[in-house]
Curated annotation (Swiss-Prot):
Function: Hypertrehalosaemic factors are neuropeptides that elevate the level of trehalose in the hemolymph (trehalose is the major carbohydrate in the hemolymph of insects).
Family: Belongs to the AKH/HRTH/RPCH family.
Coiled-coil regions listed: none
Tryptophan amide modification, residue list: 8
Sorted UniProt keywords: Amidation, Hormone, Neuropeptide, Pyrrolidone carboxylic acid, Secreted
Stated name of the protein: Hypertrehalosaemic factor 2
Subcellular location field: Secreted
Main localization of the protein described in the UniProt heading: secreted
GO MF entries: hormone activity
InterPro entries reported for this sequence: Adipokinetic_hormone_CS (IPR002047)
């Protein structure tokens, strides 16, 4: 399962 992970 791929989820959006912000790299901020």
């Amino acid at each position: 399962q791929l989820t959006f992970t912000p790299n901020w």
